[in-house]
Amino acid sequence: MAMTTASTVFVLPANVTSVAGASSSRSSVSFLPMRNAGSRLVVRAAEDPAPASSSSKDSPAAAAAPDGATATKPKPPPIGPKRGSKVKILRRESYWFKNVGSVVAVDQDPKTRYPVVVRFAKVNYANISTNNYALDEVEEVAA
């Protein structure tokens, strides 16, 4: 049995009216034929530009507001030891207790329970050489 492919183009215009308060956007979906077999889906979406009112152009306060909004506050200081620094492990139940390892990465999210990833030269009984520790479970040592 021979199968023939039909050349089809399907375009779905978005004629949806926007709800009050929602931004209006324009989108279209089209299925284009391909010679290689298979179908292709093309989705395009574009936002309509908001109409500029003449009152916002004339007032200097409105022009100054976007400049003030772009100002960012300074970054907080980094959490934990620096990457590559040597740390001593203070967690008693750890295989590497009182051993020294090097910091691989530190998660900067303050909600993370164990943000410090430490790599050791010696592997444990499960053939693992890295572990995560809390900030109070590591002590930075001079290299």
UniProtKB/Swiss-Prot annotation:
Principal location: plastid
Phylogenetic placement of the source organism: Eukaryota, Viridiplantae, Streptophyta, Embryophyta, Tracheophyta
Transit peptide endpoints, chain numbering: 1-44
GO terms, biological process: photosynthesis
Source organism: Arabidopsis thaliana
Location(s) in or outside the cell: Plastid, Chloroplast thylakoid membrane
Protein name: Photosystem I reaction center subunit IV A, chloroplastic
Cross-referenced PANTHER family: PHOTOSYSTEM I REACTION CENTER SUBUNIT IV A, CHLOROPLASTIC-RELATED
Family in the record: Belongs to the PsaE family.
Post-translational modification: 2 isoforms may exist. With or without the N-terminal alanine.
Bias (Low complexity) ranges: 48-73
Top-level taxon of the source organism: Eukaryota
Annotated segments matching region Disordered: 43-85
Keyword line: Chloroplast, Membrane, Photosynthesis, Photosystem I, Plastid, Thylakoid, Transit peptide
Gene3D superfamilies according to UniProt: 2.30.30.50
Gene that produces this protein: PSAE1
GO cellular component: chloroplast; chloroplast envelope; chloroplast thylakoid; chloroplast thylakoid membrane; photosystem I reaction center; plasma membrane; plastoglobule; thylakoid
